[in-house]
Amino acid sequence: MMRCQPLSLNGQLKENKMDKDFYKSLDLPVIAAPLFLISGPEMVIECCKNGIVGTFPALNQRTTEGFEDWVIQIKDALALFEKETGKKPAPFGVNLIVHPTNIRVKADLDVCEKHKVPLIITSLGAVPQIVDIVHNYGGLVYHDIIKKRHAEKASEAGVDGLILVAAGAGGHAGTLHPIPLINEVKKIFSKTIVLSGCLSNGNDIASALQMGADIAYMGTRFINVKESRAEDNYKDMIMQSSAEDIVYTAAVSGVNANFLRPSLEAMGITEEQWKDTKKINFGNTSDLAESEAKAWKTIWSAGQGVTSIKDSPSISELVPMLKEEFVFALDKQKKLLDTYT
């Protein structure tokens, strides 16, 4: 499989040695997003073996000890893969919920520091001290945002990249269209831009780069892979759904997120209830993990990109397909450009 060159579409990655080293082993400019309850070491390992960044939430393991076991499992599997094949796998990443009431965040960060996790994705808080710790061992920190104000705070914290969660993304999505969101953020941030929202095929990846992103962030597409921990009924519902079946509501967990309408209806949640809002209350870490898990286990999240998902391949089947579509889309764009020059 052809390797991607170090990305430099926006003139940033080629100037940052850490970024350049991080991405030189990619086959495709894609990060498989950390999916709550769904991403496990199996998915991360297969993503990295196939040349895209694999990630998972630290809270997918209920204890820090279990989390460390997963990190070790991933590192060992990727080291063995490189030894046996001579091919350097793509790097992996961990999502940390950086919130004052997450009492596990320091312990989980200590694990990341100990094992030098290449990429840390922070949510619900951009903390300079975390950035410093990760930079000291040579890692990168990306922070997910839904609006310019969040981007400004993350930029001040010194993060290496911003994940722009645009309208239509699965999970805790924003409400802004990707084009104005990218344009707003690029006014105040000159490092790596990662775009999330409705990216399900290779053409979508090419479109994300054309809009000004450096990397595509794909979540819903990876719910429907064989290595996913999602239930078969969940995968079937995604394949049967369209963009109109996605409901944006705070009724499930107190924070606005996108969910599958049939899943809400199956739990007896009415349209009136979708419009209810609740104040966010994370409680302690175990409460956060358990309460969120209970909600998201029975009510399934997905983005509007479901409209393009009609299968459930293995990651080793999906990545080459995405690459073929991506290359075809870029070639088509080049031919179109030639028409006007």
What are these regions (language model features)?
Residues 36, 196-201:
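Gly/Ser-rich catalytic serine loop of serine hydrolases
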Residues 179-192, 200-341:
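Conserved active-site-proximal phosphate/metal-binding subdomains
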Residues 11-13, 17, 113, 219, ...:
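Generic low-complexity, intrinsically disordered sequence content enriched
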Residues 13-192:
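Active-site entrance/lid segments in N-terminal catalytic domains of soluble metabolic enzymes
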